[in-house]
Design a protein with these regions (language model features):
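Short, surface-exposed secondary-structure edge patches
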Residues: 15, 33, 50-51
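Short beta-strand segments in beta-sandwich/barrel cores
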Residues: 41-43, 59
């Protein structure tokens, strides 16, 4: 996975929300971008030994196949798009 702090393009962004401790399950995450608009998200992905903490303004590009879990550590808003 690659983390970046630059905003992604507006092409296919849809802002969604997660409540504190709520979990988003992504079964086909490869090629997707996750950008945090508000709050803090914890991200882990099958086959990746590293976990990620993303804060508002940061984004992550999923480079592996497999299940990814995204958990809100605070009230959060995010955008998920295809890379």
């Amino acid at each position: 996975m690659t983390t970046q702090s630059q905003p992604m393009s507006q092409k296919t962004m849809v802002k969604k929300r997660l409540h504190t401790q709520e979990v988003l399950r992504l079964t086909s995450s490869q090629g997707k971008q996750l950008e945090v608009a508000k709050g803090v998200l914890w991200v882990t992905q099958e086959g990746d030994p590293q976990d990620y903490l993303l804060h508002a303004g940061e984004r992550l590009i999923f480079e592996r196949r497999g299940l990814a879990l995204v958990q809100a550590l605070t009230e959060a808003a995010y955008c998920l798009s295809q890379n």
